[in-house]
């Protein structure tokens, strides 16, 4: 019976775990992004950072920038993994491909389905969404 009570306590704590998620292009990642991620991480037990890519949008961002070389999705994922390597068991980096999804608000339904699929594939369900963009705030109430 003592073991069962212990197991119930562990299960109860697991249910209480705060899981956060942040979406961004991180094109390129900068100190504002890093500070936002650490601020979000300070409020949760586990944080999932979603690096969003869209081939056409990313190309336009590159042409409109002063970057000498276009960062690939792999570059952006590697930057994030490198920056948060000491928190790799608490801050998880994922990739969301947004190719073919119309921009907000027209692609809202397709985008939210892609996000839900990613959550399912990566086996997590966020209890809080952190974002500087208003469009993501409504995702919480619709999901």
Write out the residue ranges for each language-model feature:
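Nucleotidyltransferase catalytic core that binds NTPs
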Residues: 3-143
């Amino acid at each position: 019976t003592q073991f069962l009570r212990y197991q119930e306590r562990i299960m109860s704590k697991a249910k209480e775990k705060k899981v956060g998620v942040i979406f961004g292009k991180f094109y390129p990642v900068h100190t504002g992004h890093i500070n936002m991620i650490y601020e979000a991480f300070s409020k949760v037990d586990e944080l999932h950072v979603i690096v969003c890519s869209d081939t056409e949008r990313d190309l336009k961002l590159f042409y409109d920038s002063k970057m000498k070389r276009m960062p690939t999705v792999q570059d952006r994922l590697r930057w994030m993994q490198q920056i948060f390597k000491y928190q790799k068991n608490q801050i998880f980096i994922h990739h969301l491909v947004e190719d073919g999804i119309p921009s907000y608000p027209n692609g809202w339904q397709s985008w939210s389905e892609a996000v839900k699929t990613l959550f399912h594939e990566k086996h997590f369900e966020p209890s809080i969404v952190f974002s500087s963009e208003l469009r993501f705030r409504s995702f919480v109430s619709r999901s």
